[in-house]
Design a protein with these regions (language model features):
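Core alpha/beta nucleotide-donor-binding catalytic domains of modification enzymes
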Residues: 1-63, 73-77, 82-85
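Residue-level signal for pocket-adjacent positions within structured domains
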Residues: 2, 30, 39, 46, ...
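A structure-centric signal for secondary-structure junctions around beta-strands
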Residues: 4, 22, 113-116, 141
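Generic structural "secondary-structure junction" signal
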Residues: 9-12, 37, 46, 74-78, ...
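Generic N-terminal simple sequence motifs
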Residues: 26-27, 60, 107, 127, ...
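Short, surface-exposed, polar/charged, turn-prone segments marking secondary-structure boundaries
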Residues: 31, 52-56, 94-97, 128-130, ...
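Conserved Class I SAM-dependent methyltransferase catalytic core
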Residues: 48-113, 117-122
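S-adenosyl-L-methionine-dependent DNA methyltransferase catalytic core
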Residues: 90, 116-171
Length: 171
C-alpha cells in the first residue's frame, strides 16, 4: 500500500499498527526541501527536516525485516552529520543495523544524473551492502531514440513504435 499525503495528519497507530509483522520491507523518503541545495537551507530550524522521525515511527510500528530510506545527499552531511547521527541512533535503538551512502542513478543504467542518499536497515543482523556501481553509461538518446517525432498537438496516450530499437536499453 502506498500512502500519498501528509503523514503528520495520520493516526500512525491506526494506519500502520495492524501491519506489524506482515511487511518485509518499508520503502520511503521524508520530504527533503529543507536539505536541498536549491534555495535557502535552514536545516536545524526547519521542522520539515525532522519528518524522518515519522518514518522511524512507521518502521517501529510495522517492524519489517528491512527498510530503505532515500533523500537528498545533504541529509547525511547537514549540520555536521547531526541528522545522520540522529537517524542512526533511533534505528539502532529499534534493533536495526544500517548501511548508507550516496548513490547516483546513472551508475546503475538510468539515463539520469541523480544523486540520492540511501539508508538500508536490517532488523537483528548486518544490513546489506549498497550495490556496487555498474557504470554502463546510458544516454537519453539510448533510451528514447526509437520514439516517434511529434508535432505540437499530435499524439495520444498510446502509440505504436515507428522505428526499431537502436540500443539494448530500448529493447
Amino acid at each position: 500500500k502506498m500512502i500519498v499525503g501528509d503523514i503528520t495528519s495520520l493516526d500512525l497507530e491506526d494506519t500502520f499498527g495492524k501491519l506489524a509483522g506482515t511487511i518485509d520491507v518499508v520503502i520511503g523518503g521524508p520530504p527533503c526541501q529543507g536539505f536541498s541545495q536549491k534555495g535557502q537551507r535552514k536545516t536545524i530550524h526547519d521542522e520539515r527536516n525532522f519528518l524522518f522521525k515519522y518514518y522511524v515511527s512507521v518502521v517501529e510500528l510495522v517492524n519489517p525485516k528491512y527498510f530503505v530510506m532515500e533523500n537528498v545527499p545533504n541529509l547525511l552531511t547537514a549540520e555536521g552529520g547531526y541528522f545522520r547521527h540522529e537517524i542512526e541512533e533511533l534505528f539502532n535503538k529499534l534493533g536495526y543495523s544500517l548501511e548508507y551512502g550516496v548513490l547516483n542513478a546513472s551508475d546503475y543504467g538510468v539515463p539520469q544524473n541523480r544523486r540520492r542518499a540511501v539508508i538500508i536497515g536490517k532488523l537483528n543482523g548486518d544490513a546489506p551492502k549498497l550495490p556496487v556501481p555498474k557504470r554502463n553509461d546510458v544516454t537519453i538518446w539510448d533510451a528514447i531514440s526509437d520514439l516517434a517525432y511529434l508535432e505540437s498537438g499530435e499524439g495520444s496516450e498510446e502509440q505504436e513504435y515507428k522505428y526499431p530499437a537502436e540500443s539494448d536499453y530500448e529493447k
